[in-house]
Every structure is written in C-alpha cells, then in structure tokens.
From Swiss-Prot:
HAMAP family in alphabetical order: DapB
Entry keyword annotation includes Oxidoreductase: yes
Domain of life, per lineage: Bacteria
SUPFAM superfamilies cross-referenced by the UniProt entry: Glyceraldehyde-3-phosphate dehydrogenase-like, C-terminal domain, NAD(P)-binding Rossmann-fold domains
Its job: Catalyzes the conversion of 4-hydroxy-tetrahydrodipicolinate (HTPA) to tetrahydrodipicolinate.
Gene from which this protein is expressed: dapB
Name of the featured protein: 4-hydroxy-tetrahydrodipicolinate reductase
Enzyme class: oxidoreductase
Keyword check for Amino-acid biosynthesis: yes
GO-annotated biological processes: diaminopimelate biosynthetic process; lysine biosynthetic process via diaminopimelate
EC assignment: 1.17.1.8
Binding residue positions for NAD(+): G7, F8, K9, G10, R11, M12, G96, T97, T98, A122, P123, N124, F125
Length: 263
C-alpha cells in the first residue's frame, strides 16, 4: 500500500514514518507538515537515503501523489478538517488525532460510506490500551463506582485524553448510573474533583517524562480494583497503526476504535 503521513515531524508522526519504512508491504510515498522548510525528506539527516516529497498542502499532496492511505497524527485543531479532506478525495484514512465530537465522527462516516472507502479513527493504537478499555467496560457492570486518571506528557494539547473519553463511553454501556462523590461535597479549589462524564470523574495529569498512561479505579464495599496500562515508548502504538492501515482495504465505512477491528 502506498502510504502518506500527515504530521510527520511530530513525535507520533515520526514514529509512523519509521514504521512504514520497516513494513515490507507498505511504501512511504509522501509526508505532510505545516509550513515545511524541506522539499524532500532526504534533507533530514535521519532520512538522507530516501526520496520522498514533503508537502505543506494536504489537497495538493492528495491530488499529486494519490496515496492509498493517509495516516494523520496532527492536532485536534485540524484533525477533523484533515480527515474530511482526505475522505472527500476518495483516499483511505487512519487517524490518531483526538478531539472528534460524535457529530463529526458521524459526518465522516457518511462521507466514507458514500465513497465506499475504509477509514479508522482511534484514540489509542496500543493493543494493551484497548484491552484495558475492554476490561474496564466489563468491570463497570459490577463496580459502578469508578474514576479515571490519565497521565500524558506535558505537550499534549487536549484534556481529557481521547482514551479516557473512549473508556468512559464504553463503561456507560454496562454501568449503572452512579454520581461519584458525596451529594453535598464542596470543591475547595475549583476542578479538584476532575471533569464529570455520566456521573464518573476523569482526572488529567500532564508532566514531562511521561508518554501515555491510564488507570481506571473501581471501588466497592471492602474492595477495590485498579486496571492500568502504560505506554513507555511510542513504538507501543505502531503495530496497531500498521494493522489499521491494512484493514482499511477491507472496509467501506469509518470505524471508531481499534477494538472494533481486533479479532
């Protein structure tokens, strides 16, 4: 498959480029960056042996290169517009950018289906993180008192993380509604109890040195249960990205969540 990478200078995008280069059945045909200084990726020392054009305009890249799939790891500010542009050009998309609303996902799915092309948006591409979300979904049926703590590097722009939101969404499918905390609790400092989602609390930590971590803490009379996943390196996401790129060939719709393509 001929693959283009959008946001290739970001930490995740850089790792995606290296992954595409490693995979025998994937070919890196273009990279995209906002206002790039380079015209070819070989102007970067690490990739000096390659011959891959660098673009600053997504539509121009799609029309000139015509890739089979675009992997997008950019920012929440442009993630939706990028994905819409990719799909409208009839190109498959794998998107790790977060911050999509349910309405935006629905609209993008309609475009994918009208074009009969596959696309996948995932808050997290680590298989371990997907298992964490599935385990939490199952546990929530028996432990409705639950809070989420997600921890990421201090350059992450959105909070809470897409993984935390997706986890909460999945738990609402099995969890009996319970509003966390005392009915008359008072926050001495605003926000001390975290964000609220369907009665659950979500807490976001941003610190240097972290990559991506999350724990889901359940409490009940006389017992507790904690489910935690840690990504110590961005390589942890790459098997999921490569799987998703290949899977888009079999799809004619947009899938939200890596768990929906795992056997």
């Amino acid at each position: 498959m001929r693959v283009a990478v959008s946001g290739f200078k970001g930490r995740m995008g850089h790792e995606v480029v290296k992954t595409v280069l490693r995979e025998a059945d994937l070919e890196l045909v273009a990279v995209l960056d906002h206002e790039p200084k380079e015209k070819n990726i070989n102007e970067i020392v690490e990739f000096s042996s390659l011959d891959v054009p660098v673009f600053g305009n997504l539509s121009e890249m799609l029309e000139e290169i015509k890739p089979d799939c675009v992997v997008d790891f950019t920012t929440p500010k442009v993630g939706y517009s990028n994905t819409k542009t990719i799909l409208e050009h009839g190109v498959r998309a794998v998107v790790g950018t977060t911050g999509f609303t349910p309405e935006q996902i629905s609209e993008l799915r309609s475009i994918a289906e009208s074009k009969k092309i596959g696309a996948l948006i995932a808050p997290n591409f680590a298989v371990g993180a997907v298992l964490m979300m599935q385990f939490a979904q199952k546990a929530a049926k028996y432990f409705p008192n639950v809070e989420i703590i997600e921890l990421h590097h201090d350059n992450k722009l959105d909070a809470p993380s897409g993984t935390a939101v997706k986890t909460a969404e999945m738990m609402t499918e099995t969890r009996e509604f319970v509003k966390q905390g005392a009915a008359d609790e008072v926050e001495l400092i605003e926000g001390a109890r975290g964000a609220e989602y369907e009665g659950m609390r979500i807490h976001s930590v941003r610190l240097p040195g972290l990559v991506a971590h999350q724990e889901v803490i359940f409490g009940a009379e006389g017992q507790g249960l904690t489910i935690r996943h840690d990504s110590y390196d961005r390589i942890s996401f790459m098997s999921g990205v490569a799987l998703s790129v290949r899977k888009t060939k079999e799809l004619e719709t947009l899938i939200y969540g890596l768990e929906n393509i795992l056997d």
